[in-house]
């Protein structure tokens, strides 16, 4: 037993010396001064191109404005020819809605001949109705379980005012010839068609983001929203 115990002790000591020799060898390893500790971090060409496509830091202001205007124009096309496309939702912006809102408010101001403040309250009224109404509809959509984001909904509702803005332009042109029965009938047809198109276009984009059993609860406020704007356009009378 003593001999076997001594053998195990000798074996353990040999293993210890071997490990010590192994680590001692590692301590002799050093970095040669002839080898430069430096290098280049290269990025694949495809990644560089992808980053450059979305970078606007070095882009002229003119190109940026033109690109944004083209994007707004493409969204106008989506509204006039609504279809099941996520482009309006994916690439949302508020420049188009702001432009349409200001244009519509400017054309509606001064509509009352009895206005003593040159139409300023009417401009504010149109501006507040459009944006406040859009916010209320968006909150209603979110509370009903809609999956669309807040700003995406504002974008859709704002861009879908385009048919009503076109109707306002047509009504202003028709009113240049007078405000008789024929003029009212023409304006009624134009506003009704534009109201229907705005409602149809907005629901085409928003319907898929709502639960199936709650779509009617979302469409009804949209109907009222565009109806109020259409009524303001139909009852517009230029000041003299």
Curated annotation (Swiss-Prot):
Residues 113-125, 171-172, 237-240 are lumenal. GO terms for biological process: endoplasmic reticulum to Golgi vesicle-mediated transport. Keywords: Golgi apparatus, Membrane, Transmembrane, Transmembrane helix. The keyword Iron does not apply. It comes from Danio rerio. The chain crosses the membrane at residues 92-112, 126-146, 150-170, 173-193, 216-236. Pfam families: Yip1. Belongs to the YIP1 family. The gene is yipf6. The lineage of its organism: Eukaryota, Metazoa, Chordata, Craniata, Vertebrata. This is Protein YIPF6.
